[in-house]
């Protein structure tokens, strides 16, 4: 893939930005109609009951629950008064559970109330809805209530045994069924009409949440989803809290999970081809992969076996046809992510080998290919994959599918192979391999996903000798807009075993250019990679970051830059901290007035630095000693 004489389509290339990891983004190549994943069921759907098929919630009742919820939020977090208030409110909820669940405003309030509810009141509300489960589950508002009730299980299952003992002692006011029995009852109801619930616009959301609860794992997508009219505090949940969360469940839950999952096998064709039902199977694969891996493998084999015997393809396996289909390709993406390495290797050899370039060029099939690359963990699989894709990296970028290239680079990082080769191919694809003076410009090109000529506005005729890199020209140009995928590419490269070329390019950036990178929502993560990569030594890190001198105040007064500065500060030695504090101290008042800067000033203890330097140095020295001690413990 050398440069040689340049064909017209290579000169002055601007690579399409490509899609984000979610589909349907501009330039992603993934068609929009019918592909958008909705965080909540749509406001209308085929399952909506008739207007008069459920009780009406009066304005007076709505007003009561609104006032009750407001009072509950203002009440102390603990104490008998609060417990009594919750008990009384949930008693009223129990009498109007169905009306609340099927009212838009009422269902939002009920979702919040369920978050406050102890075990027994929630069970009574659930029992009140039991005779109308189908109505609630397939209602555009009721579905949220059932999801919220199910998502209380991680909180309540631990207290179930304790409250059951209290109930036996009290001998009154207890629910007729335990929480475990209610969940199993819902699972039995769903299992009896599995196709109906899975194929319903709203009911499928209940199935997906139920699968997670039965498996004792709440997936990231569920935890990150906003629920109703949550308070602002609830919506400020840190990102690190939105990862898959596991919790203990009874053995009966896992047994029922296996029963539900067996239902997929009975009508596998429906779950592969129907857009709504397919989402349920995708969630099942994720949960089973974590909790019942053998059954997950069995389900994956059923999907692959069905697809590989349907249709015909003149250019290879019938599976290739389904990789190009909007619905089945999504399911196959999930299959690729959960397959064990030996099965993934055999799937590649039997169905995909020799077809990767075609898949990379396809507007839909390139996404399953990205998932295949994300799943590569062995040199045995990476070797043939790299051999197929390496000759066409520039063409794939030009087609607007940079996600394929980034996924391949990520596989090289993960496996620890072909790193030097893929970097050389990237330099050639972005037209900065030759002359060698251009290589120092690779970071802005990778970050913006632009070829050299486009980024610097050059016009080169076909067959012309590429011009040498002009340092003055590069220094005068402001850093272009950093793309998300460009940032991911640089993060992968910085975690390569030898990231020297990328670090030299970063070191060649001027202070304002490096500042722009740190202030960018996507680019700030490149600085994170510099600070955290085990391949970047302290000396190399300091050489890059020294260009930020003179930019610390602007960095501190930026949303993303302030976070980068905090990270730099955390790892800085005492001498570097003095330099940072001295520069910030010159603009102390500006920092204090800035919404981001005043947090940095507090973190740096800037007032102490300016007024009591000796005390500040003692404090920072003690912090440095504790950090060194902790690092030595962690290294041991």
Curated annotation (Swiss-Prot):
Region span, Disordered: 1-59, 222-241
Transmembrane segments: none
Cellular-component GO terms for this entry: 90S preribosome; nucleolus; preribosome, small subunit precursor
Any GO BP annotation: ribosomal small subunit export from nucleus
Assigned keywords, A-Z: Phosphoprotein, Repeat, RNA-binding
Gene Ontology molecular-function annotations: RNA binding
Chain positions found as Phosphoserine: 7
Mutagenesis / variant outcome for changing residue 497 to Y: In a breast cancer sample; somatic mutation
Pumilio repeat locations: 92-123, 189-223, 313-348, 351-386, 509-544, 547-581
Gene3D superfamilies per the UniProt record, alphabetical: Leucine-rich Repeat Variant (1.25.10.10)
Domain of life: Eukaryota
UniProt feature, compositional bias: Basic and acidic residues: 45-57
SUPFAM superfamilies found in the cross-reference section: ARM repeat (SSF48371)
Biased composition (Polar residues): 228-238
Family classification: Belongs to the NOP9 family.
Protein name: Nucleolar protein 9
Encoding gene per record: NOP9
